[in-house]
Regions:
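Thiamine diphosphate
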Residues: 1-153
Length: 153
């Protein structure tokens, strides 16, 4: 959570991008709720259709969605279909060889700088940030774009 809060501050200070930070205590419960609602809607086609908790909470959000997890990307991806727009997931896929949490998060690209890059990339895909500026962002944040993919170690 600290990395996400740090990323939100960088987005605000350096790029004038406001970020709302949400915390997920259980992706499993969000998924279970959404699947239960989906099943109910399937079995009750002539009833008013229900919305999952996640869909209700995010329905009026107009920004981009980035999930950063110390678990594999599949965890936030497991609820992505109930987001109103594309979810950009960051996670710790692969095998880490790091001596500290800070180094581990950098290795797996789930630290503040990678969260900032993910958010700005998602905004660029929606035409809300200049794609031509992304290389400058990568340099400014000190990200090595040619680093080996941590999933391949």
């Amino acid at each position: 959570m600290n990395e996400v809060l740090k990323a939100a501050q960088i987005l605000e200070d350096d790029y004038k991008v406001a970020a709302d930070v949400w915390s997920v205590t259980s992706y499993k419960e969000l998924r279970r709720d959404a699947l239960e609602v989906e099943r109910w809607n399937l079995l009750h086609p002539n009833e008013p259709q229900k919305q999952s908790y996640l869909s209700r909470m995010l329905a009026k959000e107009d920004g981009v969605f980035v999930a950063s997890s110390d678990y594999v990307k599949a965890l936030p991806d497991s609820v992505s279909k109930w987001f109103p727009r594309t979810l950009f997931s960051l996670g710790t896929d692969g095998f880490g060889r790091s001596d500290s949490r800070e180094a581990l998060r950098d290795f797996f690209e789930v630290d503040a700088k990678h969260i900032v890059l993910a958010a700005l990339t998602a905004l660029a895909k929606e035409g809300k940030f200049k794609t031509t500026e992304l290389n400058k962002v990568i340099k400014r944040l000190g990200i090595n774009p040619d680093k080996k993919n941590p999933m391949r170690f």
